[in-house]
Amino acid sequence: TWDAEGFLEVCPEMSGIMRGEGEETFCRLVTYYIEGEGSLSGIRGLTYRGEDGRIHETGDAELPDLDRIPFLYRDPEAFENRIVYYESSRGCPFRCSYCLSSVERRVRFRSMELVKKELNIFLEARVPQVKFVDRTFNLDHGRTEELWRWIAEHDNGVTNFHFEIGADLLTDRELEIISRMRPGLIELEIGVQSVNEDTFREIDRTMDLER
C-alpha cells in the first residue's frame, strides 16, 4: 500500500505492513520471527506498530535483481493441467494517475537466457497455459520479437502463452511473427480503459487511439 501508516492508524488490529516488493523484506522478517535475529527497525520496507504503540517506518527496501528471485515451478507434477503465472519483468514506464505501478517508473527484466530456460520447463511438462504477468509485455520490441520467435520455434502443440500488451505499441514485425504462429499459441490481453481522449488526458494515460 502507498499509505501504510494511514492503514495502521485506522486498523489497530494490524501490527505491520510490508511496503514495495516483498521478497527481501519477507525473508528478513521470517528470519527475525523464527530465529530472533536483528530487530524490526533494521528491516527495510516495513511500517509497523512498536511495543510503545507508536507507528515506525523503516527505509524503502532495495529493488531486487529479478534473476535472483527463485523459480518456484520445480516439480512438473505440481502444475500438471494448470495455468501457471510467470513474471519476466517488473515496473511500468507510464504514469497513469489511478495506478500504483506509476510510482516506480523503472522497468527491470529477468535475463532472456533464464526466461527461455524456465519456459522450456513448462513446455516439457506440457502445461495448458503460461500467463505472463508483465504489466506491458511489448515495451521492449527487441525482447518481444526474440521471445515470440523462440516460442514459435519451440511450440509443443499444447501450451499457449498469455500476454498483457499495449495494442498501440505493436509493430509490423511483431504482427508478422504472430501471423506465422499456430492459431491459439499466444493470447493477447489489451487493457482499453477508455476511447475518450479527454479521459486519457485527465488520468495521464498514454495511448495512440488511431493505431
Regions found by a protein language model. Give the residues of each.
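A short, sequence-level motif marking secondary-structure junctions
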Residues: D60-L66
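Radical SAM [4Fe-4S] cluster-binding motif and immediate context
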Residues: D67-R211
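A generic structural signal for short, non-catalytic loop/turn and secondary-structure boundary residues
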Residues: S39-S41, E62, F79, N156
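Glycine-rich beta-alpha loop elements in corrinoid/cobalamin-binding modules
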Residues: T1-G59
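A generic "binding-loop/recognition-motif" signal
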Residues: G22, E62, C92
